[in-house]
Amino acid sequence: MTNRSQLASWQALEKSATKMKQSHLRDLFAKDDARFSQFSTQIPGLLFDYSKQRIDKDVFTQLIALAKECDISAWREKMFNGEKINITENRAVLHTALRNRAHTPLIVDGENVTELVDNELAKIKLFVEKVRSGKWLGYSGKPVKDVVSIGVGGSNLGPQMATEALKALSDDTLNVHYVSNADGVQIASVLKNIDAETTLFVIASKTFTTSETMTNAKTAVDWFLQTAKDNAAIAKHFVAVSTNLEKTAEFGISNDNVFTMWDWVGGRFSLWSAIGLPIALYAGYDAFEAILEGAYEVDEHFKNAPLEQNIPLIMALLSVWNTSFLGYTSQAILPYDQALHMLPAYLQQGEMESNGKHVNFAGETVPYTTVPIIWGMTGINGQHAFYQCLHQGNVIVPADFIASIKPQVNVDKHHDILLSNFFAQTEALMNGVDEQEITADLTAKGKSQAQIDELLKHKIHQGNRPTTSMLLDSVDAKTVGRLIALYEHKIFCQGIILEICSFDQWGVELGKGLASKIEAELVDERVKYAHDSSTNGLMAYYKQHRTQ
C-alpha cells in the first residue's frame, strides 16, 4: 500500500520546499506586483488573502496537483452523497445535510435524511418560539428567563462559540449559560445566579451517559428539586438532545421534549443540529436559520468552485504545505473581533480532534507530520501576550488573521485602531526589519554608533512569517455559518490529503475508559486495577489528603 509521500506531486513539493526555505516573502512581493490578485479570492461576505504565505506559482500548481492526485473531488462527492467515509466506524459524514437549504432529498440507509432534518428543525422552531414568547411556563407558572446548556466537547464548544459571536446582536429575551467542566466550581457559579422557577436546562448527550455531562445534569436536577420539591416539575424545566429515549425518560424528561441527532453527525460538527438549540433559544430561530444559510452558501462554493479558487481546499493545502513540507508544527488563529474570541478554542477541537492521527486509511503509520497544534486568542490581546515570539522567536508559527469591516458595535475610532493593528501585524510578520532599516532609524533618533551596535542584533526581525488574512463584511449570523463551514471543509480536505480518518476520535475514547476505571477505585477501596508507579503514587497522595 502506498502512502501520500510516494505520490509524484508530493515528491515535487518536497523539492520545492527545499527551494522555498531559501526564499523570502519580501522578495516574492518585490518580484510580482500582481501577487495579491493572484493569491486572493472572494465569496459573498468574505475576502480570502493568502498572498503572504510562502508559496509561488509553481508551488501552488503542485499543491493543486496533489489535491487532484488524492482524488479530492471524488471524496467530496462521497461525503455529500452520504457514503460511509468514516471508515473506522462505518458511518456517513453528513453535517452538510443539516443545513441543506435547497431541501433536496438524500437517501441514506433507506431513510430520507432531508426529511428527518426538516422535521427536527420544525420541532426546534416551534419550541424556541414557545419559550422566547413566554408561552412555555415553568412549574410555578412563570416564563423562562435563563437557559443552562449542559454538555461537553462538541455539544458545548460550538453552541457557546456561536452564542458569544452573536451576543452584541441579540436581545435580552433570555440569558444562556454553558456548563461543560466536571469541576463543580463551574456549575456552582451558574446555579447561584439563577432561579429554579424560571430556568430551562438543556442536557446535550447523544447517549445520555457521557460522564461529565450526566454528573452536571444530576447536580442540576438535585439543585432544582430543592426548590420545586416535585419530580413531576422536571418535565417543565429539562429538555434533552439525545438518541436514548429510555435514559431521558428515566431522568424525567418527556419524549416530546427530546430533540434527536443521528450517528452520521460527529459532535464537533453538530452545532447545525439540535445541539445548536441554545443558539436558537438565545439569538432567536431566525438567527439560527441564518447560520445554516451561511454554511449552505459555503457548501455550494466548496462543491462547485474550481479547485484553484476553492477556499476550503486552499486552506487545507496551505496547512499541509506549512506542516508536512516546511515543518511548521503550530498554527495560530487570531481573530481581530471580540465576537470571535472563542473561535480559536473551537477550531482547536475541530482540527486537532479530527486530524490528530498518525495512521492512514490502511492503518499504516504515516512518515509525515499531520495536524499542527492549533491555538490563539483575540489579536490585540495576543499582541501583548505572545506576538513577541511570532515576530522574533526561532519557531515559525503560520497564522490566520480574521477581521470584520463593519463592527457589531461602532464606538468612536475603536474599529479603525483595531484594523490598523490587523493590517500592520501581517505586514510586519512578512517584511520584518533588517539591519539597514534599524541603523537608519536609530541614527535618526540620535543614537551613537556604540549604542547602535549594542541594540542592532536585538532589534532585527527576520520576517518571512506566513499568514493568511480573512476580511469579513461583518460578523452576523450568516457570517458565523460561513466561517465555521469554511474551516469544516478545510478539515475534511486536510484529512483526505493526509489520508487521515477525520471523523473518529479514539484518543478521546481511551481517556474516557481509563477515567471510568480509576473513578471506581477512588470511591471504593476494594476496587483495584494495575497502574504504573507514578499513577499509583498520585492516586495514593490524592486519597490520603482529600479528607484532611
UniProtKB/Swiss-Prot annotation:
* Cellular component terms (Gene Ontology): cytosol
What one GO molecular function would you report for this record?
A: monosaccharide binding
Give the catalytic activity.
alpha-D-glucose 6-phosphate = beta-D-fructose 6-phosphate
Please list the GO biological process terms of this entry.
gluconeogenesis; glucose 6-phosphate metabolic process; glycolytic process
Q: Which residues are annotated as active site?
A: E353, H384, K512
Chief place of localization: cytoplasm
Q: What compartments host this protein? A: Cytoplasm
Q: Name one Pfam family in it.
A: PGI
Under which EC number(s) is this enzyme classified? 5.3.1.9
Q: Sorted alphabetically, which keywords does the UniProt record give?
A: Cytoplasm, Gluconeogenesis, Glycolysis, Isomerase
Q: Which family does it belong to?
A: Belongs to the GPI family.
What is the protein name for this chain?
Glucose-6-phosphate isomerase
What organism is recorded for this protein?
A: Pseudoalteromonas translucida (strain TAC 125)
